[in-house]
């Protein structure tokens, strides 16, 4: 019999880095970060725990990719993360893309030196209305131009009606008003 050797590579969500990265790229890269964290946890951490339970001999592998700090930066509510800060700015009377960027910078900028400086997932940019996120794949500089307007865009009525008819109670309840 002939043996077939195969290595498959799946690009889960397609990390995006362009010359100018905006809200859409943050959403895509955030999704990719979450999926990669899920994959790492389930394929590596849980699998090694299963080996230990079954007393299978193996060499422990530290994959060293805990993506939670970056995920926390994006989705945290305390301290306020990128998405929560964006939602908050959208309801403020005199909010702008500038005030949004300033809020992120004042909340997340690392100290100039020390251990937190090197491990911070947020970096201020030298350019106006921009910030940098240290994703696992690369550092990405995001332009916050028009983020408040993009976040205020209403959900399409047809999409909301379709989601309201979902067989999954969590989804249908979320879109029934």
Can you describe what each PLM-predicted range is?
Residues 1, 8-175:
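Extended, low-complexity interaction tracts enriched in P/G/S/Q
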């Amino acid at each position: 019999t002939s043996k077939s050797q195969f290595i498959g590579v799946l690009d889960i969500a397609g990390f995006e880095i362009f010359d100018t990265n905006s809200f859409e790229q943050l959403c895509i890269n955030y999704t990719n970060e979450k999926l990669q964290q899920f994959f790492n946890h389930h394929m590596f951490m849980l699998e090694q725990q299963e080996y230990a339970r079954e007393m299978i001999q193996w060499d422990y592998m530290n994959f060293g990719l805990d993506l939670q700090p970056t995920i926390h930066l994006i989705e945290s509510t305390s301290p306020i993360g990128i998405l929560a800060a964006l939602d908050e700015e959208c309801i403020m009377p005199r909010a702008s893309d500038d005030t949004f960027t300033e809020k992120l910078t004042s909340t997340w900028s690392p100290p100039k030196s020390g251990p937190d400086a090197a491990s911070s997932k947020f970096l201020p940019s030298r350019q106006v209305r921009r910030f940098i996120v240290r994703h696992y794949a690369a550092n990405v500089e995001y332009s916050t131009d028009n983020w408040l307007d993009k976040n205020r865009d209403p959900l399409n009525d047809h999409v909301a009606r379709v989601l309201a008819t979902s067989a999954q109670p969590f989804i249908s309840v979320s879109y029934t008003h």
